[in-house]
């Protein structure tokens, strides 16, 4: 009986489209079809910091199909995305020193990965946050929410 409940919980978490920051870290995959493997990242407020581990599971190079993961307040998402285009590939499509950016990984190509540590005290419970890929044109399909729980 207990094992069937555990299996049910595991299956529900697999199909929820959400990734819980187990152990205060999150593994997110991006692919050549311009998709992340999740639409939501749940962060426990008890974490002092959490790590976002981004892995590009595709094979295309970063100048063609590069991906990153940028976290901003949802209200700042579009402006940060637009300003990132001007930064170009050399700037990881993130404006240098942009205070609206909570955290971001570097731009990675197929088979590459990067990680970034996020100070959870910078995330306010109740505030809406968005994570997205700032490579030009990708954010329409590659974005989700960060929720502090």
Curated annotation (Swiss-Prot):
Listed as disulfide-bonded, the cysteine pairs are 24-47
Primary role: This methylothroph organism uses azurin in the electron transport chain involved in methylamine/methanol oxidation.
Q: Which PROSITE patterns match?
A: COPPER_BLUE
Question: Where's it found, cell-wise?
Answer: Periplasm
**What region holds the Plastocyanin-like domain?**
22-149
A Gene Ontology term for the protein's cellular component: periplasmic space
**What upregulates this protein?**
Produced during both methanol and methylamine growth. The expression of the azurin iso-1 gene is affected by copper ions.
Q: Where does Cu cation bind?
A: 67, 133, 138, 142
* Main localisation: periplasm
Single Gene Ontology MF annotation: electron transfer activity
Q: Which residues form the signal peptide?
A: 1-21
What's the protein called, per UniProt? Answer: Azurin iso-1
- What NCBIfam families is this protein classified in? azurin
CDD domains, sorted: Azurin (cd13922)
- Which keywords appear in this protein's UniProt record, sorted alphabetically? Copper, Disulfide bond, Electron transport, Metal-binding, Periplasm, Signal, Transport
Q: Name one Pfam family in it.
A: Copper-bind
């Amino acid at each position: 009986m207990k094992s069937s409940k555990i299996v049910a919980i595991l299956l529900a978490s697999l199909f929820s489209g959400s990734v819980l920051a187990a152990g205060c870290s999150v593994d997110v995959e991006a692919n050549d079809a311009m998709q992340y493997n999740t639409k939501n990242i749940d962060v426990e407020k008890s974490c002092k910091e959490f790590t976002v581990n981004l892995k590009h599971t595709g094979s295309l190079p970063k100048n063609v199909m590069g991906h990153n993961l940028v976290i901003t307040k949802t209200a700042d998402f579009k402006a940060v995305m637009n300003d990132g285009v001007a930064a170009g590939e050399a700037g990881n499509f993130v404006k240098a020193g942009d205070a609206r950016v909570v955290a971001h990984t570097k731009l990675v190509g197929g088979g590459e990965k990067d990680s970034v540590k996020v100070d959870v005290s910078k995330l306010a419970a109740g505030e809406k946050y968005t994570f997205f890929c700032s490579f030009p044109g990708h954010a329409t399909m590659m974005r989700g929410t960060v929720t502090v729980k």
